[in-house]
């Protein structure tokens, strides 16, 4: 069977508004049939808190603490909870809902993408597993943080979450993006989450470090981001017969960026909930 051609993008380091604008621009141009399915890698400057689409900003985030720590703040197009993007490799995948990797709904598509991500990480020596889903029961206090518990088909190591992802579907196109954590920074994340008391904050921060991890801790060594990306690309190729062609943003995508970046930078978008 001939390999399917995908575009491989590495857009490097950008500010939070640009990063989210690029993901949406890729989605919109793919919806119009102007671009192939795309795997993108990127990074963030400054380190940034990204909110899930449905989160309530003023209820969950201490804006003064965000400012004091010099963090960026942006609301994602995807759902889920707050993520601190710091020392990580961020990926996104855009393809149509009827693509073989995406058919069947959210959970099956999560699983297919997780298999490729996990295979790439295993090539590095990480003994990762794919979580089957959330455990039952209620916590004493549910935080707004994404990495405090694994969700459906997310990647764990020894039961601790290593990769967190979120997905949205718009106009027949799927956007999934996620964070492959290199070193965990719970201190900054929990400093900006609103808590009922400092005692609760410290208790949940300790729990967070018990339930999440970074790749450097798992491997006992530092792996360069480029090596991680190469392994993930090879895993997609091996599992799903995808041929990746390195490329850049199209003129159509670039043409959308100014307006989309302004949307993500606007207070109305950030405070929409």
UniProtKB/Swiss-Prot annotation:
Stored InterPro entries: aa-tRNA-synth_II/BPL/LPL (IPR045864), BPL_LPL_catalytic (IPR004143), LipM (IPR024898), Octanoyltrans_LipM/LipL (IPR050664)
Gene Ontology biological process terms, A to Z: lipoate biosynthetic process; protein modification process
Enzyme Commission identifier(s): 2.3.1.181
Catalyses which reaction(s): octanoyl-[ACP] + L-lysyl-[protein] = N(6)-octanoyl-L-lysyl-[protein] + holo-[ACP] + H(+)
CDD domains: LplA
GO MF assignments: lipoyl(octanoyl) transferase activity
Main function: Catalyzes the transfer of endogenously produced octanoic acid from octanoyl-acyl-carrier-protein onto the lipoyl domain of GcvH, an intermediate carrier during protein lipoylation.
More details: In the reaction, the free carboxyl group of octanoic acid is attached via an amide linkage to the epsilon-amino group of a specific lysine residue of lipoyl domains of lipoate-dependent enzymes. The reaction proceeds via an octanoyl-thioester enzyme intermediate.
Subunit structure: Monomer.
Name of the protein described by the UniProt record: Octanoyltransferase LipM
Species of origin: Moorella thermoacetica (strain ATCC 39073 / JCM 9320)
Gene that this sequence comes from: lipM
């Amino acid at each position: 069977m001939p390999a399917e051609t995908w575009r491989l993008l590495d857009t490097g380091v950008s500010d939070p508004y640009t990063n989210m604008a690029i993901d949406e621009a890729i989605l919109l141009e793919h919806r119009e049939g102007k671009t192939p399915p795309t795997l993108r890698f990127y990074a963030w400057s400054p380190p940034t808190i990204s909110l899930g689409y449905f989160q309530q900003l003023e209820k969950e985030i201490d804006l003064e603490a965000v400012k004091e720590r010099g963090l960026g703040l942006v609301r994602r197009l995807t759902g889920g909870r707050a993520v601190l993007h710091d020392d990580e490799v961020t990926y996104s995948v855009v393809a149509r809902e009827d693509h073989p990797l995406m058919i069947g709904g959210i959970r099956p598509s999560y699983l297919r993408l997780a298999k490729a991500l996990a295979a790439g990480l295993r090539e590095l020596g990480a003994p990762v597993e794919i979580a089957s889903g959330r455990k039952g029961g209620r916590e004493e206090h549910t935080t707004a943080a994404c990495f405090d518990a694994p969700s459906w088909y997310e990647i764990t190591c020894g039961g601790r979450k290593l990769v967190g992802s979120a997905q949205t579907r718009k106009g027949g196109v799927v956007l999934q993006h996620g964070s492959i954590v290199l070193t965990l920074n719970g201190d900054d994340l929990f400093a900006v989450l609103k808590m009922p008391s400092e005692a609760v904050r410290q208790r949940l921060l300790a729990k967070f470090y018990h339930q999440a991890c970074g790749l450097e801790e798992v491997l006992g060594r530092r792996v360069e981001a480029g090596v991680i990306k190469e392994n993930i690309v090879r895993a997609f190729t091996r599992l799903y017969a995808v041929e990746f062609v390195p490329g850049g943003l199209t003129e159509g995508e670039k043409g959308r960026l100014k307006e989309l970046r302004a949307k993500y930078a606007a207070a109305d978008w950030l405070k929409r909930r």
